[in-house]
Each structure stands twice: as structure tokens, then as C-alpha cells.
């Protein structure tokens, strides 16, 4: 049996290989027992539950690799719900701040939980949220540690994890051919990951990654891999809540000036907005774009009053203008050809700033500010209309104030920001729990066309926090214990022309999601979305049915997409277009996911047939994978996608 277990860890049927070797020096009360782990493992992966609480098409705008890395790591090292702090719970994007308050109140009133099934006694926690929490939490009678552990215990009881990954394609790509424009490296993608951790107190590790086509151990990569990430994080060290060195990510306020962490789409707004917690996370993924490099720390000055400081210096990829300035900052992280390598680490960026926030009896207020500079000036091509207000120069600053209030029924949050641009951006959200079965959410945002922040990432219909004025209204209703209806409507207006438009545009976006639970094992769902943006109309329809037992899970889904393109008169398309008729296309996907769990063995399989007329009618689907390797892909044309995965 140990030999079979090792081989299954090493082999992925299809196109990849991966090894994952956890090593535990010893065990103490901070380690979760195998019995507890086995009790709460579900035969259906958490990714599929999360998919139903999110919008598939919004994953294109999400740093999904960073997001999946963090949640997968938490799934591998779940938290004891009885001892988890409010900040730790708020790291999960599917829990609202008011739901976290309800959980904390329940734990305080009843002195903890005996089983995870008690979550059903909290009316504000939905069925899907309970299933997700089973993947990231467990219940045990553990006493929270009162002081930071000794170095001796950290070294003795800490856990070492080593993981390697190799992807072998069974096809030839255009760039694999020899020639001046071909890739300089081989077609295999591989990487290595090491991490040492002791509970929630110490985390240290590194990541080495190589994309297919990149040279390994030669040229600029004389140290082997093209990308490395090193990090060290210490938490709960007296008044020091967090000390992080190396590569890290930050989320301050609601992201109007600083957020290089992930953010979600509109459907998840119903659960994610209202949080303004300052968060420092290690950068342990393969992504070479959204990270800072240096040091960041949070210190508690007084009860409820925290101060965060951060400093970063890193190299960046860029294309240069004829004058020698930065025309475009590149974030692909690909260095396969001579042209891509010539743009590697061509400039540098320095960032220094801080955040201070205060919390008391549900109220919170904070302020964030930073100064950033580049070794070469930013010189965008402002002759293009949509780049007219792009940042220009070599030094920039931004400041913001965030605020809010959280209670059982109300969740209010907002942030207002400005900077050297002299313009203003503001985002404000409010959610009211009318009853245990009905809640309303409203979001207002105004982002001036002249406003910019180089590190912003927040709620928006467009691709950036700039030139947008909109209102969002959403609701969640549970008319009975078996039914849940979620809906939203969002309107946005863009005063300045966007890419491929010639005038002001607007968008309407509507969604309705219906969930029905005929029994504890069966789930039926439907989702319809209608979106009109700059004259282009996209409609999406989805039906699915899933069954989950102790060892088996199965999910069948049907997706249909209809797209209609607006004409040039509506302000869309290329300016040179002479088409007088609107183009339209459609597509569909039939997909099946099956999972099996038995003791240490987990098997997953997916099979899908898709048929779309073009890229505009593309379909999105979840595809299982090994640790930190699964994906949500978009497919167009006609074809079959399948995957078989074995894990232990």
C-alpha cells in the first residue's frame, strides 16, 4: 500500500507529473489529527462549491493562480473553528463580515462548537458556505496558545513540505520549432516548491518555476529557474501581528489605491464587500506579476489600533519607447524568445508606504498612503484616446481613507482616494439583513477618468479603477430551507472612450441564480445572465445537477452562450469597420465531473464537449488538477476536454 500511495502521488494520467512529500518532525497540540482530517473530507472538491458562488467569466480578471494557491494551502492546513480569529475568517472570500460576526457570537455564547454540523444553526450561513467551510475548518477542543512558541518547539514540531511539478505536452507548438523566432528553451514546464511552517506562527519557503519554452540554467537563468520567490512570515509575536520578509502581497482598504492580491466578480460582491482589513500575505505562487519585494509588518499600538508599514524594491519587465521611457509594463512573466528576454528586468520600481486603522464596537476607520517611483519614466502612447489619462512620469503618490460599520444586520464599508493626479475615486457599499432569509446589497462607485493608481484593484466593470460611474444592487433570498435565489443588476457609465470605442459608453449587467436542494445529497441549480456593454450583448444560461455521497460525487452541467455584436454606430468595434450588420454567434458545453474518495485515495475525472462559433461565444469550465494546478478555462471552437486525476 505505501508503494501504491507513492506512485499515485507521482503520476497524473494525461500530461503532468507531480510529487508532494510532507515531512513532520513531530506532533504537538497545534497539529491536526488524521482522524479529524478524515472526518471532514468531502468527496466533492471545494473548487466546485466555490464555482457556484462566483461568476466563471470573471475569472479572466482574477489572479486565479494566486487565489487558488492560497485556498489550496488553507485546505491542506485547515483552521480550528473554535480558535480561529476574526481576521483569519475574513480571509475567506465567501464569508461576509456580518456572517463572521454571527459565527464569533455563536462561539462565544455556546463556548465553541462540538461538530461542524452546528453551522446549520446559524441562519445566515448558506448550504454552499457550510460545504466550503468543511474544507477549510475543523472543530476540536484545543486551547488557543497564549504566547509565541519557543524556537526549540518551532524547529521540533514544524512541518516541511516539498513539491515538484513537471508538465509534458503531447503536442508540438509553433514556437517549439527551431529558428530566430522560436523558443530558446524546451517545451516542458516544471517547478519546485518548499515550505516550512509551524501552525499559524511561522511560514518560510521558496518557489522555483519554469514556463515552457524558457531556457533553464543558461543565459540570464544561470541559477536554474527563470522565476524564484523567497519569503518568511512570522505572526502573533506579541504586539507584532505580522512580520513578512521577501516577496509578499498587500490588500489595503477596498483596493482603490493598493491591492495586488486577488479580487472577485460581481456575484461574490454579495459576500466579499465591506471588508477593509489590512492584509499581508506571502507570495508563494508562480505568478511573476502581482507581488512586492522587501518587507512589511503590522504592529498593534493599542487595542483596536494597528499600524502597517511596507517597503518594496523589484525589477519589472517593460517595453520601451523611442525616447527611452517605459511604454508598457509587462506582467506575463514569459521569457521564451530573444525579444521577450530583451524586455526582462529592464526597469525597477520602488514603493514605500503605510496604513493605520482603528476598530471599536463594529466601527472601523483607516488611512493608507504610499509613494512610488520608477528607474525610467512612464511614457504611454497618449495619442490613443483610451490612454489619454494614463499615468506619466517617474514618481507618483496616492492616499485614501476607508471606513465602515459591521453589526448583525448592517454591513457598511467604503473608501475614498486621491493622488498626484488631482482626481478622486470613491467606492461605497451597504448590506442589510432584512431577515434571516433575505438580504439586500447596494454598491456605488465613482472613478474619475483622470484618477489612477498603479497598484489599484477593486470592484469595477472595466479593467481598471478609472473612468467609471456605476450602481450595483443585489439580493439573496431563501424562501424555504431548500431554496436559495441570488440576483443582481449593475449599471455602469464610462465617460471617456475605451479600447475599440469612439465615444462614451455604458453597460447593463443582470444575473439570476437559483439553487434547489431536494435532499441532502442532491443539488439542482440554474443561472441566467444578460449583459449589454457598448452595444454588444452577451447572454449565458447554465443548468446543473449534482449528487454527493460519503465517497462519491457527480456533477452534470449544460452551458449555453449567445453573443451579438453592436455596429460601429454604437461606438464599438474598430474605427475602420465598414460592417453594417450586427454579427452574432452562439455555443454550448456539455460537461460531467465525477469524484471518488476512499481513505487516502482521491480520484477525479471530467469530460466535456464544447461547440462554439467563435471566441466571443466562448464557454467557461472547471477542470480538476493536482495541488496548485487546477484551472478554470475558456474554450471555443469544437472539441473535447477531459482530465483524470489521482491524489492522496
Segments from the language model and where they lie:
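Compositionally biased linear targeting/interaction segments
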Residues: 26-216, 220-233, 238, 247-251
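Short loop/turn motifs that connect adjacent beta-strands in outer-membrane beta-barrel proteins
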Residues: 152-159, 201, 234-243, 252, ...
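Exposed, low-structure sequence patches enriched in small/polar residues
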Residues: 183-187, 345-380, 388-648
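Outer-membrane beta-barrel proteins
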Residues: 209-227, 281-288, 342-345, 417-419, ...
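Outer membrane beta-barrel
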Residues: 222-317, 438-453, 602-615
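Aromatic- and glycine-enriched pocket-lining scaffold segments that form the walls
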Residues: 289-338, 345-357
Amino acid at each position: 500500500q505505501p508503494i501504491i500511495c507513492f506512485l499515485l502521488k507521482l503520476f497524473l494520467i494525461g500530461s503532468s507529473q507531480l510529487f508532494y512529500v510532507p515531512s513532520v518532525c513531530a506532533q504537538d497540540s497545534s497539529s491536526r489529527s488524521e482522524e479529524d482530517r478524515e472526518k471532514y473530507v468531502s468527496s466533492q472538491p471545494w473548487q466546485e462549491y466555490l464555482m457556484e458562488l462566483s461568476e466563471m467569466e470573471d475569472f479572466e480578471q482574477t489572479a486565479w493562480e494566486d487565489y487558488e494557491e492560497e485556498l489550496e494551502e488553507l485546505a491542506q492546513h485547515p483552521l480550528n473553528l473554535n480558535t480561529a480569529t476574526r481576521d483569519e475568517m475574513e480571509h475567506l472570500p465567501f464569508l461576509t463580515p456580518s456572517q463572521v460576526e454571527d459565527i464569533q457570537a455563536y462561539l462565544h455564547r455556546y463556548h465553541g462548537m462540538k461538530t461542524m454540523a452546528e453551522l446549520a444553526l446559524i441562519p445566515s450561513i448558506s448550504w454552499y458556505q457550510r460545504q466550503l467551510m468543511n474544507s477549510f475548518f475543523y472543530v476540536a477542543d484545543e486551547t488557543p496558545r497564549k504566547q509565541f512558541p519557543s524556537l526549540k518547539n518551532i524547529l521540533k514540531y514544524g512541518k516541511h513540505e516539498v513539491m515538484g511539478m513537471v508538465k509534458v505536452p503531447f503536442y508540438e507548438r509553433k514556437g517549439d520549432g527551431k529558428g530566430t523566432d522560436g523558443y530558446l528553451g524546451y517545451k516542458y514546464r516544471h517547478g519546485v516548491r518548499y515550505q516550512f511552517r509551524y501552525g499559524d506562527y511561522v511560514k518560510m519557503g521558496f518557489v522555483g518555476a519554469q514556463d515552457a519554452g524558457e531556457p533553464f540554467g543558461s543565459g540570464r537563468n544561470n541559477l536554474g529557474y527563470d522565476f524564484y520567490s523567497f519569503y518568511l512570515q512570522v505572526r502573533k509575536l506579541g504586539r507584532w501581528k505580522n512580520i513578512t520578509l521577501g516577496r509578499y502581497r498587500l490588500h489595503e482598504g477596498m483596493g482603490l489605491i493598493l491591492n495586488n492580491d486577488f479580487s472577485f466578480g460581481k456575484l461574490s460582491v454579495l459576500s466579499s464587500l465591506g471588508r477593509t482589513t489590512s492584509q499581508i500575505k506571502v507570495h508563494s505562487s508562480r505568478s511573476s506579476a502581482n507581488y512586492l519585494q522587501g518587507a512589511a509588518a503590522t504592529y498593534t499600538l493599542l487595542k483596536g489600533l494597528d499600524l502597517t508599514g511596507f517597503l518594496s524594491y523589484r525589477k519589472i519587465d517593460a517595453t520601451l519607447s523611442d525616447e527611452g521611457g517605459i511604454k508598457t509594463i509587462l506582467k506575463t512573466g514569459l521569457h521564451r524568445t530573444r525579444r521577450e528576454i530583451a524586455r526582462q528586468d529592464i526597469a525597477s520600481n520602488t514603493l514605500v508606504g503605510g496604513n493605520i486603522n482603528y476598530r471599536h464596537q463594529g466601527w472601523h476607520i483607516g488611512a493608507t498612503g504610499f509613494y512610488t517611483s520608477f528607474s525610467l519614466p512612464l511614457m504611454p502612447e497618449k495619442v490613443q484616446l483610451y490612454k489619454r489619462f494614463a499615468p506619466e512620469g517617474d514618481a507618483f503618490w496616492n492616499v485614501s481613507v476607508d471606513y465602515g460599520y459591521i453589526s448583525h444586520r448592517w454591513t457598511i464599508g467604503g473608501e475614498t482616494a486621491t493622488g498626484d493626479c488631482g482626481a478622486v475615486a470613491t467606492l461605497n457599499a451597504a448590506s442589510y439583513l432584512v431577515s434571516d432569509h433575505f438580504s439586500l446589497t447596494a454598491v456605488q462607485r465613482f472613478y474619475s477618468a483622470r484618477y489612477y493608481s498603479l497598484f489599484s484593484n477593486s470592484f469595477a466593470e472595466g479593467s481598471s479603477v478609472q473612468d467609471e460611474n456605476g450602481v450595483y444592487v443585489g439580493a439573496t433570498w431563501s424562501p424555504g430551507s431548500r431554496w436559495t435565489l441570488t440576483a443582481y443588476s449593475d449599471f455602469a457609465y464610462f465617460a471617456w472612450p475605451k479600447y475599440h470605442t469612439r465615444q462614451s459608453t455604458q453597460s447593463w449587467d443582470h444575473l439570476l441564480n437559483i439553487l434547489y436542494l431536494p435532499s441532502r445529497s442532491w443539488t439542482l441549480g440554474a443561472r441566467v445572465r444578460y449583459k449589454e456593454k457598448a452595444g454588444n450583448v452577451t447572454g449565458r444560461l447554465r443548468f446543473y445537477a449534482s449528487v454527493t455521497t460519503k465517497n462519491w460525487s457527480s456533477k452534470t452541467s449544460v452551458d449555453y452562450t449567445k453573443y451579438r455584436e453592436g455596429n460601429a454606430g454604437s461606438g464599438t468595434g474598430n474605427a475602420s469597420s465598414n460592417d453594417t450588420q450586427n454579427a452574432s454567434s452562439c455555443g454550448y458545453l456539455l460537461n460531467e465531473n465525477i469524484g471518488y474518495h476512499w481513505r487516502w485515495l482521491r480520484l477525479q475525472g471530467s469530460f466535456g464537449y464544447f461547440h462554439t462559433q467563435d471566441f466571443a461565444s466562448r464557454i467557461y469550465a472547471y477542470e480538476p488538477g493536482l495541488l496548485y494546478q487546477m484551472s478554470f478555462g475558456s474554450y471555443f471552437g469544437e472539441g473535447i476536454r477531459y482530465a483524470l486525476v489521482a491524489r492522496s
